[in-house]
């Protein structure tokens, strides 16, 4: 859609909304920036806009404006069943998210990654591999820069490697990657998607516009994805940490291999990698399958996998203080992600958990404590819920904190040389922190100042 001289309303005044306005200004659209939060300071919103131009509307929305608006662009935090979105849909006005908006201007090849866990690490690794092959590579999403901020730099010979959330996939229409991947589907964001079936369907939309000329990489150990595979419109390639697939990357003992269906190829030994944990073997297998599908030579793939180091906030080594290793896994925002971090620990571990309640259950989280966790330090809204689950399974060594400062103090006082301290909350950061990045960086600053 050519948006020049069209009137576009953007909902949300956060990073995503401001980024959308910036792109729309550059392509010649007329913008309205709307946020229903009446408490917002108009002047601060104007300052966020900088040199960008948009009519700012805060609070109530006048439906008389509908007749002049050609397109609604919503931020990921705006549910598609919210009143403002339904008003536009009922009026027959298209509703896009930031992914669809950016895709409208992407001239290059797109590689897109989603999944409940592992997105950031896999996106970073795929981005590093592709960039070693072609310097015109843009890594976008929760990692790196925003898609809307980078898209006008793309060209016919460029690559975009995009990390995409379920919230963003709710609003795709024509988005078409040449290679997509769904890493896994486990319970998350059920306060938004309501059911696992709806959540899984939303994730699967990443391949909705693909054809058999494209590739969709799926996890052979995920039942949602093995059930989805026959319906997938793309050519399916698998990855697995447990067994050899028909076609794809897999772990065989200490070797990561690739099979094309006829021949098997050794890629690298797991001990040649800098990443901790079995879940990272899965991430590497997914990245290998994706980059081979994109036509990247094996020698470049192997070299970059060996060079790759953990991303910030994902089982990130922070420091050793008084013989105690501290790890930041603030990106572990659901129980399944946190379990993988716990499993990666090889020393007696003091675990920091809790945060905003997304409707998760914590049984798997607590079950993972056995023979791993010596003390649990709880913080945030879910403290009582997690503690109740601990009682259910007989885990009683729990302390509580009201701030990250208290958390780190408790950990430092209880840890002995040879222990590990792991921040892997199994919950979102909202309420106490702006985002998981802020939570992780505050933790790291406090640890480094011990």
From Swiss-Prot:
Record-listed ATP binding positions: 115-121
SUPFAM superfamilies associated with the record: MurCD N-terminal domain (SSF51984), MurD-like peptide ligases, catalytic domain (SSF53623), MurD-like peptide ligases, peptide-binding domain (SSF53244)
GO biological process annotation, one example: cell wall organization
Pathway(s) of this molecule: Cell wall biogenesis; peptidoglycan biosynthesis
Keywords annotated in UniProt: ATP-binding, Cell cycle, Cell division, Cell shape, Cell wall biogenesis/degradation, Cytoplasm, Ligase, Nucleotide-binding, Peptidoglycan synthesis
Sample GO molecular function, one term: ATP binding
A GO-annotated cellular component: cytoplasm
EC number(s) stated in the UniProt entry for this protein: 6.3.2.9
Catalytic reaction list: UDP-N-acetyl-alpha-D-muramoyl-L-alanine + D-glutamate + ATP = UDP-N-acetyl-alpha-D-muramoyl-L-alanyl-D-glutamate + ADP + phosphate + H(+)
Recorded family membership: Belongs to the MurCDEF family.
NCBIfam families the record matches: murD
Reported function: Cell wall formation. Catalyzes the addition of glutamate to the nucleotide precursor UDP-N-acetylmuramoyl-L-alanine (UMA).
Listed name of the protein: UDP-N-acetylmuramoylalanine--D-glutamate ligase
Chain's gene name: murD
